[in-house]
Amino acid sequence: MVNRFLRALFYWPIRITATCEPIPFEPLKHIKIDPNKQIVYIMVSSSVGNMLTVERLTKQLGWPSPFEDIVIGQKKLPRTAYLRDPTFFGSTGRARDISGTIFQWFAASREINEDLQIIPISVLWSRDPSIEGAAIRGIDLATPVWRKFLTLTFAGRDNCTIISDPCSAFYLEERLKSVGDYILRKIMLNRLVALHFLRKARTIVGRPFPNRSRLLHELVQRQGTQSAIAEAMEKDGKSKEELEKKAYEIFDIMVADTRYPLLRFFNTIISLIWKRIYHGQSIVGANKVRNLVQNGYEIIYIPCHRSHMDYILLLFAIFHEGLPIPQVASGDNLNFFPVGQIIRRCGSYFIRRKMKGDTFYTALFREYLSVLFERGYATEFFIEGGRSRTGRTLPPRTGMVSMTVQAQLRGIERPIAFIPTYLGYEHVMEVGSYMHELEGAAKKKESIKGLFGIFKRLRYYGRGYVTFGEPVIVPRFLNKHVPNWHDYIDPTGNSRPEWLYDTVNQLSHEIMIKLNDSASVNAINLCALAIIGDADHTLSINMLKRCLKLYLLVLSCDERRKGLMPSGSLDTIIAQALELKKFRVYDVGEDMKFVRPSRGQTLQLTYFQNNILHLVALPALIASVIIRNGHISRADVISHTRSLFYFLKHELFTPITEDELDSFINKYINVFVKGGYILDLDHNMLALSGDGYEELLILSNSIRLNLVRYLIAVTLLRQINDGTLTRKDFVTACVDLCKEVPSEVTNNSPEFADPIMFNIMCDTFVRHSYFSYSENGTIIPEHNKIVKLAQAAEPLLAAKLVRHLKTEIEKIKSHNVLGHEAAKAAQAEAAAKRTPEAEAISATDDKRPIISNDSAKTENKTHGAAISEDKIESSAAACEDKMQSVSEFLDDKDAKS
């Protein structure tokens, strides 16, 4: 009766002043509820404010109200058990025997043999961890009435409601039976419940933020800093006082100054902006991070870097999932007024973008990182260094990973866990400027003017995607790769074991693989993959649906993609992609509808295609091998795919290990067979099916430019002699050759000649012994291996293109004797003499088989069961003619509009 009166009295005041933000952010996706079992609740306090907040949330989730009683068999019992009752002045409240109600649930459920779902729920009225040395707020077991009144009045909208996973009543009862004495069971149950709520609250609130002034002085006096100062004194001859002052100034620029009120304010602003420009967000994997935090791991978020919006998206996800708020590494280019001071108070620390050569600065930064790790603060940094202009994951910058491993080698007790975090978008506001930069435009410096320019571009951007991937645990990784790493622990931080460099590179590569493995696939990614894969970038709606169906079949082969792919029908996926206006639908009459990129959007679609290219690279390569043969044995498909996949794997950080490769190749082949795209004939022979040729061709085109780059590199390597080219010269020559490839092949893609791709390729060549370096840094090719690689790559591309590349290489061979500038002049002269015929090179002709003699013999026996190559050629030609006429019609329509 009293509860009903208080509920009626305080319902509207609490409804107005308080929120009920749940943790996890989307409970129904993460909390598994059995609809056939009744629900009961365990709460910290019987406070009316807590009860009304929980009631509001349970109503949204479709769960019963905590105010209602529960009927179990013939018994009517309270649905909610409480740990404490609030008092007016007491800080901890009055203890209640929670075990009494729980034991009643046990007895009643046993009588009718029906299990109950016990859900612990707690309400935090402040998430402010405060500053070191101050009292921690928000974790009290039961807030007194007077403080609750003030909290509701001034900070009621800062609360969060923590929902734990349900526990079976039968299971809990069985666990308690191991304690023989009834009194001990009651004591243990009360303690377990109290400990559970306390751990949950501390996980959400996190550690108190460091006192910046105290931390600055402490950093200067630490042993590592003093050692760096002593080395600098010997090297530069400066006094200790001068260097200590310099160290203090560096730390003053570097160290964060996190303030919770500002974080909370910006979270409110971010939430408002987010709801305006994004149509929701998907957050996956937060439970893994919460479990690591509760088990005492040091958390380091490693997000991919796509946009300046990454900071906002990740902070939104972290805040709303109740994860530890990190200290974020930011480049010193963002430390300008007033942005620098604002983001510093939001948890950013500023570092130079290039530290190489400055041992003093590097030592100081290493010391600051060690302090953060030792004290248990979560951190965040972008392992790619800068934003990706192409949409692909960039090669890792290993500096901070190395410092992290060195911090672990100091002997800190907390194991460090890297959390690869994928951030996905349906639109990136900077994508237009990225395309200009790839074409050669200068990068614009960050400024306050540029910041205001961002607000002008705020519009509908689709959906945001955050995926917390599988963690990479540093001690576990070291145990696997360096079993005796404990022998190198040095509390001074001076440990530089000889295995550090290689191990850090392997660790960084592992992080990138896990990062790409957590990629979310959205509608715009899939549609871009199909549209850009077509030679004319024009598809009928029906063909687009068929391509999407193939992509979804291929992606669903990997169980790790579960929960990371778009749901809904193919029409729904296309409708979601059309919302972004990156391509349009044209009705050409007779119930024929076609899609093609909107004006100026073709290059931007390549960016979103590249976001998921690593997920379809292997099936696309398999499709290429099968298409170029028509008939081929399964064993030959595996062999040819293996020979080229290593380059795709290292360039795209494809998340498939060596042990999994053959299994995945067979899985994708089976999907093609089951979907009717290819035929599985006798004697393990595979052949093209007439129905699925176009979809396979579009899929294979997604990696065509990658194969062209490999062919450029391999063809150049075949022409050079030992010791005539350095790595830098080789990359430059490859880039120059890329610029000579006709636009009909490259689709004017500015990323095609990106030097980063060829630098990654060089690493792969060295890793797999295709070439090595001499003492003076020049390339020494392994010609036998390179010839075999060329023989695998050349048949997958047009013969005219192969001949054209060889001709161009002959023209620039003078580079070796004339030098780079003279070679450029020679290239310019050769380009002026090029005939128009050399430009007209098709990327899809000359389907020369690459099968073995045995496969060819088997082919003759099975020729009648599969589509003939003549039919493939005529089908492809008819398709191209039809699409050409449609493309011309749409061009005319665009011109008129």
Indicate where each model-derived feature is located.
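Membrane-interfacial terminal anchoring regions of lipid-handling membrane enzymes
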Residues: 1-897
